[in-house]
From Swiss-Prot:
Subunit and partners: Identified in the spliceosome C complex. Found in the Intron Large (IL) complex, a post-mRNA release spliceosomal complex containing the excised intron, U2, U5 and U6 snRNPs, and splicing factors. Interacts with TUFT1. Interacts with DHX15; indicative for a recruitment of DHX15 to the IL complex. Interacts with GCFC2.
Keywords: Biomineralization, Cytoplasm, mRNA processing, mRNA splicing, Nucleus, Phosphoprotein, Spliceosome
Family note: Belongs to the TFP11/STIP family.
Protein name, as recorded: Tuftelin-interacting protein 11
Residue numbers of Phosphoserine PTMs: 2, 59, 98, 144, 210
InterPro entries given in the database record: G_patch_dom, GCFC_dom, STIP/TFIP11_N, TFP11, TFP11/STIP/Ntr1
Motif (Nuclear localization signal): 700-705
Functional summary from the UniProt entry: Involved in pre-mRNA splicing, specifically in spliceosome disassembly during late-stage splicing events. Intron turnover seems to proceed through reactions in two lariat-intron associated complexes termed Intron Large (IL) and Intron Small (IS). In cooperation with DHX15 seems to mediate the transition of the U2, U5 and U6 snRNP-containing IL complex to the snRNP-free IS complex leading to efficient debranching and turnover of excised introns. May play a role in the differentiation of ameloblasts and odontoblasts or in the forming of the enamel extracellular matrix.
Region (Required for interaction with DHX15): 1-50
Annotated source species: Oryctolagus cuniculus
Residue intervals passing through the bilayer: none
Predominant subcellular localization, coarse grouping: cytoplasm
Span list, region Required for nuclear speckle localization: 710-734
Length: 837
């Protein structure tokens, strides 16, 4: 903004001697033009003030100028300003009027656009200036001088290859027509009469000038034509923020978006200025104004930079700067908030459109559900009408099942959502009671199984994770079986005799896959087991002709472990019955044999050791071994129990009661010049009385090898005495044959065990991996049905403890150690198996 109009004297002239003096007096001209501040005023020169209308005008005055200030004439003598009285306002008004009367048409000669406003170039034209000096000549005949010459230019161009009608250059790339010039209409500045482009330029360069861009660029360079007093030629740089940048910034100014900082009251002492100031929050520092340092003492003012002229500081307006900055921030905040609001509204429109689509889908779904529910209600009401006693076409159970099947097939969702329990109670239960009113389950155990299976698929709630008595309110089928079917079963069980178990077992086998699990458990625990328990208490093994296993064992597939409480009283009664038993009575074996696989291995072995083995030992002790007249009945009574008692128990009986007497008879026979052929037959005859499993036992094998050694020593010791021909060779051959049989049997057993182990392996890779001793123990435990598992959190000397049946063991370098009373004792695998059994 130019302030040159402030540096004039009382007569409106600029003081050449003191350009920095400001005159703020209000003249009569200011009062007269109070409501017309844009009126241009003609400042009178010295000659006009002296001579008035008779003043002469130099040609320099008529020359157009871009500045409102008249250039100085340094060749003229020095003029002094008169210190006389200032002319009055009335006298100046007369001069203005006379001047206006003399020049009535000066304003009319200018174009319309330059009438009431200033040109934007910053200069002021006087009304008396009508044009530029020498600018009235027309350029229409430019270049016509070529007609009065010899055309040397045209000839030279043609010699250099120029072809008329084509452009200049090697490739004729030059322009064909000369550049046209357009004459300006008036005497105004550039752009005062609109665009000055010619028709040729519009054809060659069809780019439309943007008047808005030109105006913006013009306003940008408007105030930069003046020279900086400091002599700097650097142009000021302006920074602009677009709306897109503000949107990308996406945040509000910290001063306006963080009012919570005002809450923190912190005392801040500011000593950066001339005096100490105290603030009570950090946010107040941001509101501090930058005050000029005009009041600082000379000592506190910064020293001037050497080599540069000290620039006088202009007047600063910190309040104005703060207000402008605040307006900028408010505008930015408003733009950001409007952008956020616009984005929010757009998102809201998208969300509402999605909600509208969802609600349309929900509405359509609800309409379908209402239509389906109406049809379901119609079917249910039809069934209710047919259930009335006076109905001519009563509803049957099969027809009702078809109605429910229709509901499940066509209206599945509504059927699942409806309260099937109440619907079944109201419609199905009366029909079901009428269907089973004459039913005798022991005579016709499969009566009603098909219709109940159909109703199970229709009524059972398959979403229940666990079924129990608490499901009566949630499952219609369970409630149907409990309230309609169970009363008939209770009535039948009360009349049933436990010793006649087959009809009841067949009945439950027919219904076990139909009735709920908890209903079957209730029947077995509350109805069947009490009657069996009572019957076992009344059973006497000495007087009852019907063996107990005939009416207990049929319940094993259904009751399984539920019969465990009955086994103890059964063993007790059997043990009492065996007190006076003799091994010659084979009925005991017939009674006990069905229980071998029912009792646990440990309990069965304990029962045998307590009640059977002592009787067999007593019988074997009474056996008389006589090679000439042998009675084998007692031996047969003992060997007949081989499958009932364990091999170890049988071998123990033989070691204690048989082999000592047998070896003694052999020695006595060999000492009396025997017939070795008869001894060989006697040896082979006794050995054939034992099974391969007994013969494979190490103790039995040692006893027979001991007999062979005795026979070999007897043959070898009779040197010089009479010896039966071929006796020594026969005994040697017998020994070799027996040893070879033992070796072949052991090899066959090892091969059989290897084949079994290979079959248990899953895949070739598993079978190729060598097994360790722990795997071997695990295999043996599986073969003998013994539980083998590690003890959690228990170790001995860093070794994991295991339970093998009821025995605690640990494995160390291929050796099994068994926990004794005080120490750990090593044992063999076979002994471990025998102890576990």
């Amino acid at each position: 903004m130019s302030l040159s109009h402030l540096y004039r004297d009382g007569e409106g002239r600029v003081d050449d001697d003191d350009d920095e003096r400001e005159n703020f007096e209000i003249t009569d001209w200011d009062l007269q033009n109070e409501f017309n501040p844009n009126r241009q005023r003609h400042w009178q020169t010295k000659e006009e003030a002296t001579y008035g209308v008779w003043a002469e005008h130099d040609s320099d005055d008529e020359r157009p100028s871009f500045g409102g200030k008249r250039p100085r004439d340094y060749s003229a003598p020095v003029n002094f300003i008169s210190a006389g009285l200032k002319k009055g306002a009335a006298e100046e008004a007369e001069l203005d009027d006379s001047e206006d009367e003399e020049k009535p048409g000066k304003q009319e000669e200018l174009p319309k656009d330059l009438g009431p406003k200033k040109l934007k170039t910053g200069g002021n034209f006087k009304p008396s200036q009508k044009g530029f000096a020498g600018g009235t000549k027309s350029f229409m005949d430019f270049g016509s001088w070529e007609r009065h010459t010899k055309g040397i230019g045209q000839k030279l161009l043609q010699k250099m290859g120029y072809v008329p009608g084509r452009g200049l250059g090697k490739n004729a790339q030059g322009i064909i027509n000369p550049i046209e010039a357009k004459q300006r209409k008036g005497k105004g500045a550039v752009g005062a009469y609109g665009s000055e482009r010619t028709t040729q330029s519009l054809q060659d360069f069809p780019v439309v000038d943007s008047e808005e861009e030109a105006e913006e660029e013009f306003q940008k360079e408007l105030s930069q034509w003046r020279k900086d007093p400091s002599g700097s030629k650097k142009k000021p740089k302006y920074s602009y923020k677009t709306v897109e940048e503000l949107k990308a910034k996406g945040r509000v100014s910290k001063k306006l978006s963080a009012p919570q900082k005002e809450i923190s009251q912190v005392k801040v002492i500011d000593m950066t200025g001339r005096e100490q100031k105290v603030y009570y929050s950090y946010s107040q520092i941001s509101h501090k104004h930058s005050v000029p340092d005009e009041g600082l003492p000379l000592q506190a003012q910064p020293p001037p930079v050497p080599g540069k002229e000290a620039k006088a500081p202009g007047f600063a307006l910190p309040e104005l700067e703060h207000n402008l900055q605040l307006l900028i921030e408010l505008t930015e905040q408003e733009i950001i908030q409007n952008d956020r609001q616009l984005q929010y509204e757009r998102d809201m429109v998208v969300n509402l459109s999605h909600e509208l689509d969802k609600m349309a889908e929900v509405l359509e779904h609800e309409e379908r559900a209402i239509a389906n529910l109406s049809k379901v209600l119609e079917l249910v009401e039809q069934c209710a009408r047919r259930l009335q006693p006076a109905c001519s076409n009563p509803l049957t159970l099969d027809e009702c099942a078809r109605v429910f099947q229709t509901l499940q097939d066509k209206y599945y969702e509504e059927y699942r959502m409806s309260d099937r329990v109440d619907l079944a109670v109201a419609i199905v239960y009366p029909l079901m009671k009428d269907y089973f009113k004459d039913w005798d389950s022991l005579k016709d155990c499969r009566y009603g199984t098909e219709i109940i299976s159909k109703w199970k698929s229709l009524l059972e709630n398959d979403q229940l994770l666990s079924h129990g008595g608490q499901d009566l309110l949630a499952d219609a089928f369970h409630r149907l079986m409990w309230e309609v079917w169970m009363p008939f079963v209770r009535n039948i069980v009360t009349q049933w005799q436990p010793r006649n178990c087959d009809p009841m077992v067949d009945f439950l086998d027919s219904w076990v896959h139909i009735i709920p699990v908890w209903v079957l458990d209730n029947i077995l625990d509350q109805l069947i087991f009490p009657k069996l328990q009572k019957e076992v208490e009344n059973w006497n093994p000495l007087t009852d002709t019907v063996p107990i296993h005939s009416w207990i064992h049929p319940w094993l597939p259904l009751m399984q472990a539920r019969l465990e409480p009955l086994y103890s009283p059964i063993r007790s009664k059997l043990s009492s019955a065996l007190q006076k038993w003799h091994p010659s009575d084979s009925s005991a074996k017939l009674i006990l044999q069905p229980w071998k696989d029912v009792f646990t291995p440990g309990s069965w072995e304990a029962f045998m050791v307590k009640n059977i083995v002592p009787k067999l030992g007593m019988c074997l002790g009474e056996l008389v071994i006589n090679p000439h007249q042998q009675h084998m009945d007692a031996f047969y009574w003992v060997i007949d129990w081989e499958g009932m008692i364990s091999v170890s128990s049988l071998v123990g009986l033989l070691e204690k009661h048989f082999f000592p007497k047998w070896l003694q008879v052999l020695c006595s026979w060999l000492s009396n010049s025997p017939n070795y052929e008869e001894i060989t037959k006697w040896y082979l005859g006794w050995k054939s009385m034992f099974s391969d499993q007994v013969l494979a036992h190490p103790s039995v094998k040692d006893k027979f090898n001991e007999a062979l050694d005795i026979m070999n020593r007897a043959v070898s010791s009779n040197v010089g005495a009479y010896m039966q021909p071929g006796a020594r060779e026969n005994i040697a051959y017998l020994t070799h044959t027996e040893r070879r049989k033992d070796f072949q049997y052991e090899a066959m057993q090892e091969r059989r065990e290897a084949e079994n182990m290979a079959q248990r392996g899953i895949g070739a890779a598993a079978s190729s991996v060598p097994m360790n001793f722990k795997d071997l123990i695990e295999t043996k435990a599986e073969e003998h049905n013994i539980v083998f598992m590690p003890v959690i959190g228990k170790r001995h000397e860093g070794k994991q403890l295991y339970t093998f049946g009821r025995i605690v063991i640990y494995i160390d370098r291929g050796v099994v150690f068994v926990q004794g009373e005080k120490t750990w004792v090593p044992t063999s695998l076979q002994s471990l198996i025998d102890m576990a059994k």
